[in-house]
Amino acid sequence: MAAKDFLPRAIPLVTVDPYFNIWSFSDHLYDDTPRHWTGHQNSMTGIIRVDGKNYRFMGLVETEREMYYLEPEPLRQLSVKLTPTRTVYTFGNEAVELRVTFTGSLLLDDLDLMSRPASYVFYEVRSVDGKAHEVTVYLDISSQAAVNESSQTVLFGKDENGIYCGRGEEGMLTRSGDDLRIDWGWLHLAAPDHQYVIVNTKDKKNALSGSPYLHLPKFTKLDGCLSDRVHLEQEVREGIPCLGCLKTSGVDGKETMTGLVILGYDDIHSIEYFGKQADAYWKRDGRSFDEVFKKAIDEYEAVSARTQAFDEELKKEALVYGEEYYDILCVAYRESIAAHKLIEVDGEIRFFSKECYSNGCIGTVDVTYPSIPLYLKYQPKLVEGMIDPIFHYAAGDDWKFPYA
């Protein structure tokens, strides 16, 4: 990587809300499996095949360290660049260059867009040597993103937008405390122009073993079992089943290969607020997840253009105070917004921070105070959404202590 790359302790990949919140804790995207912000695995794997040889660009095939497995050779990471709304990785060798961009739709001037439960992974492959190359790109996200513990069971299915897995309404909003992850609702993957697959670690290892070739039939062995709303059930710790997709194309000196993967999460109900199960802001006016997710798929290009324009605007303002200040903002912007959940209660917005530890509390003043400047600048309504629940709670009988 370039010596000047800014490398924070954790690099944002998927930043939607406190539960759908995945980061890379390593300098290279392929050094370790991506993780939830609590530190637990939310594995994602990326494999690129170039002229019959497999390279790994994201995560690990075998996520259990005690299970010895010779991982595919990584495609060397050349750089990682952060902007307020995007993380851009570049990989390459003497034949091809692969650029992978993780984008969050976190624009504070548009609450519908900011609260949208979707995140983008866009990739582009180009020929470096000017020659023609056959390329296959495979990307997955594991069902770990839909459970609190790997002993839990998930269901898999397919719908008009793509494929999904999860636990539905089972156990919804029944846990509180430290070190918890969502274990209800549905994790979704959509990938236009890709082949959908559902595989586990064993499937991936079998497909990659014995030869340098990625055996596509083994990657698709479960695909034929799926039809609309038909479920396959599997325990997460039994092989870490994943939602996956792959695409094959050719690149040369003129033609590049591109692909778009959209990750989404339908949490059904988001927060229990004074005894009432409250929904996310994006659900207001009766909107369904399928409708909102389809809109996220269709609007990628427009969202990408808007986020890039915002990034440039913020960069121009921040660089007045120095490059290091801008680097910090590139991490803090997504971290702060995705540490909150935006809901609507009786026509009023509520914007809750969520602790991953510190008792797992929401709406804590010690988090609200330092984060307020961001929202005063870009969306003061969210400041009201932070403070109103605190006043509501303080006015009630639940808090009986003489201190704040």
Regions flagged by a language model, labelled:
Residues S115-Y120:
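Short, solvent-exposed loop/turn segments enriched in Ser/Thr/Gly
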Residues P18-S26, G46, F91, F122-S127, ...:
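Well-ordered alpha-helical scaffold segments within catalytic/enzyme domains
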Residues M1-V61, L75-S79, G92-V100, L111-L113:
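Beta-strand-rich N-terminal accessory domains
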